[in-house]
Amino acid sequence: MMITLDHVTKQYKSSARPALDDINVKIDKGEFVFLIGPSGSGKSTFMRLLLAAETPTSGDVRVSKFHVNKLRGRHVPKLRQVIGCVFQDFRLLQQKTVYDNVAFALEVIGKRTDAINRVVPEVLETVGLSGKANRLPDELSGGEQQRVAIARAFVNRPLVLLADEPTGNLDPETSRDIMDLLERINRTGTTVLMATHDHHIVDSMRQRVVELSLGRLVRDEQRGVYGMDR
């Protein structure tokens, strides 16, 4: 099992209602899962728990071999090396080229220069940006910037890719291209967990759907659509 949440509850002191309430979810290696639900349903907390950015109030969180809520200090970066993250707002380094943005993800974990020089061009080819390695982010379209962000998340070949509204700032055609790319990455064996509000993407792809509402798990459905009655 790649991801396990076992009776996980997260209670913030500032709220009377738990952000997550007794959540039980298991995700296998290589699955593609949509995490859906309205704002405030607990999606962001769910993902932050996987990254050890939050600690559950009760229950167990596991990612691959990592017992996440028992990790301490120096072990947290080891967990994050096996998880790639993609966000709605790209979060690129504006003064670095496409190549250097992707290479930076390997530099910070101490990869050798020869390995970086070998792997980065391969990943840029995968995301369709081989010809734009020397461009700066402000010279790219929104879709191209998201491709850079995906390349950066994938360059270390993570076991899990977390995508938080990766198409939220993109037009429908560009969104479809980004989803095609995420599907290709998923086919390499990477587990993909994507939080989204995009009905059209969820309905067209018919992947597993995990739905949260007010911190509770209300649906876990294979080949699901966005709404239960659609």
Curated annotation (Swiss-Prot):
UniProt subunit comment: Homodimer. Forms a membrane-associated complex with FtsX.
Family indicated by similarity: Belongs to the ABC transporter superfamily.
Bilayer topology: Peripheral membrane protein
Main location group: membrane
Keyword terms: ATP-binding, Cell cycle, Cell division, Cell membrane, Hydrolase, Membrane, Nucleotide-binding
Protein's job: Part of the ABC transporter FtsEX involved in cellular division. Has ATPase activity.
GO molecular function: ATP binding; ATP hydrolysis activity; magnesium ion binding; manganese ion binding; transmembrane transporter activity
Protein name: Cell division ATP-binding protein FtsE
GO biological process terms on file: cell division; transmembrane transport
Domain ABC transporter: 3-228
GO cellular component: plasma membrane
InterPro entries in alphabetical order: AAA+_ATPase (IPR003593), ABC_transporter-like_ATP-bd (IPR003439), ABC_transporter-like_CS (IPR017871), ABC_transpr_LolD-like (IPR015854), Cell_div_FtsE (IPR005286), P-loop_NTPase (IPR027417)
SMART domains the UniProt entry points to: AAA
A Pfam short name: ABC_tran
Gene3D superfamilies: P-loop containing nucleotide triphosphate hydrolases (3.40.50.300)
Binding site for ATP: G37, P38, S39, G40, S41, G42, K43, S44
Subcellular location: Cell membrane
